[in-house]
Amino acid sequence: MVNVPKTRKTYCKGKECRKHTQHKVTQYKAGKASLFAQGKRRYDRKQRGYGGQTKQIFHKKAKTTKKVVLKLECVVCKTKAQLSLKRCKHFELGGDKKQKGQALQF
């Protein structure tokens, strides 16, 4: 289980900063796919009418996890950066810190 704090002091590449500043951490989430991207328009046109499925649907999935991507926003200049972490099954943002000698809780 990976537990990441909601703020982190790290280097900012923004023109005003270019030094270590406080950053607000959120988890990256993919945006909604556009209906007007060239590949989607081509695919929709190919799918029209009779003839069933025209392109293969991928079934041989190999990975069981995705890499976690953090979105870092500078508190000073609002510049955003992304940082990818290793793969993990359980990810937590701003959870309680671990304490020595405590029993495991799920």
Swiss-Prot record:
Confers resistance to cycloheximide, an inhibitor of polypeptide elongation. GO terms for cellular component: ribonucleoprotein complex; ribosome. Keywords: Antibiotic resistance, Cycloheximide resistance, Ribonucleoprotein, Ribosomal protein. Pfam families: Ribosomal_L44. It comes from the Eukaryota. GO terms for molecular function: structural constituent of ribosome. One of its GO terms (biological process) is response to antibiotic. This is Large ribosomal subunit protein eL42. Belongs to the eukaryotic ribosomal protein eL42 family. The keyword Ribosomal protein applies.
